[in-house]
Amino acid sequence: MAEFKVVVSDETGHTRQFEVDEQDANRFLGRNLGNEVDGNAVGLDGATLELTGGSDDAGRPMREDVSGSDLKELLLEGGVGYEPTRDGERKRITVRGRQVSDETAQVNAAVVGETPIAVLLGEEEPEDADDDGDSDVDADEATDTDAGSEEDNDDDIADAE
C-alpha cells in the first residue's frame, strides 16, 4: 500500500506537510507532474493541487522530462537534481520519472488559485470579505461621478451652439 508525504505550498510561499496513505494516497498514484489532484486527499476541501515535483526514499528527484516512474541515469548540465559548480560541468545523476508510484516518498504540490493554505484549513478568515465591501462603494461613487460628467458635457455642447 502506498504511503508518502505531500508538501503543499501556496502563492504566499507558506508550506504545509501532510502524510497520506491508503485511499488518499491512491488519488496520487499514476499521476504525472503537472497534473491536478483534488485537495480533499490532504484535507484541503475545495482546493485543487498541481503536482510540481517529488522524490523517492533515497532522495532521488522526480524529473518532468523523464517518462514513467522508473530510475534513469542522465548526464545533466544542471536543473532538477544537479547544480554544477563550474561552467560546462556535467555529471551522470540517477533520477526518477515524472509518474507518482509506490516508490515515491514525497510529493510536492502547489495550490491552484490565490487562496492561502491557512484559509483552506480554517485557521484564518479570508481577507476578501473586507475588500469586497469597499470596492462596491468605490464603484458606485465612480458611476455617480461619470453620470454627472455626461450632463456637464451636454451643457457644454449646448452652450457652444
UniProtKB/Swiss-Prot annotation:
Keywords for this protein: Ribonucleoprotein, Ribosomal protein
PROSITE patterns: RIBOSOMAL_S6E (PS00578)
One of the protein's GO biological processes: translation
UniProt superkingdom: Archaea
Region (Disordered): 119-161
GO (cellular component) term, any one: ribosome
Compositional bias annotation for Acidic residues: 122-161
Name of the molecule in the record: Small ribosomal subunit protein eS6
Species of provenance: Haloquadratum walsbyi (strain DSM 16790 / HBSQ001)
Lineage, uppermost ranks: Archaea, Methanobacteriati, Methanobacteriota, Stenosarchaea group, Halobacteria
Annotated gene: rps6e
